[in-house]
């Protein structure tokens, strides 16, 4: 806890009730449709947010990277339908019991202020992502997406979900993936695609982010 900024998010000392959780890659930090019992603070690792749509399709919504809260919307709104949060890689989270701390945290001005800043940053990042989807070619967006979602240099997202997230056709996605293989950026394997040239992929991704504001998400 001393190595993170977690304790600085609250006016009250929450050390006694803070727990440490460890999640392996592909473990679920939050199960869809189940109210989380804990307010998580991701201190290390990356995770993805999923939602099941009315037609039964599973849609990839967003990515999280440490440090950030997970479950803060459910803390504020008890009626909010929880979405699935899955670890992309090994994740470590500090956590507070949601039920016990909800009344206290909803009256903690420091926590609420930090939460407002966090949510505004998420909203800004989503706006930037939408703008990038409209303004940059798929080679740049797919490079960033691969770096966001890769697990130990292995990219294995479902093509249907990736195409939907990037707002392109399935065929267009496969065409650019084949181009990356031809250019030596990726190697096709049985489990997915191995990243062969991270530097070149990062260069393509950072063309959309010259100020490196989101480069921490792509470690």
Swiss-Prot record:
Cofactor binding description: Binds 1 [4Fe-4S] cluster per subunit.
Localisation per UniProt entry: Cytoplasm
Domain (HTH crp-type): residue spans on this chain: 136-199
Keywords: 4Fe-4S, Activator, Cytoplasm, DNA-binding, Iron, Iron-sulfur, Metal-binding, Repressor, Transcription, Transcription regulation
Residues annotated as binding [4Fe-4S] cluster: 68, 91, 93, 116
InterPro entries assigned to the protein according to its UniProt record, in alphabetical order: cNMP-bd_dom, cNMP-bd_dom_sf, HTH_CRP, RmlC-like_jellyroll
Gene3D superfamilies for this protein: Jelly Rolls (2.60.120.10)
Induction (free text): In the stationary phase, aerobic expression is positively autoregulated and significantly dependent on RpoS and Lrp. Its transcription is directly or indirectly repressed by FNR.
GO cellular component: a single term: cytosol
Positions of the DNA-binding region: 158-181
Needed co-factor(s): [4Fe-4S] cluster
Function: Transcription regulator involved in mid-term, stationary-phase viability under nitrogen starvation. Might control expression of the salvage pathways or in some other way repress the recycling of nucleobases to nucleic acids and enhance their use as general nitrogen sources during nitrogen-limited growth.
Note: Its activity might be modulated by a sensory iron-sulfur cluster, by reversible dithiol-disulfide formation, or by both mechanisms. It is not an oxygen-responsive regulator.
Subunit note: Homodimer.
NCBIfam families given in the database record: PRK10402.1
Protein known as: Regulatory protein YeiL
Source species of the chain: Escherichia coli (strain K12)
Gene this chain is encoded by: yeiL
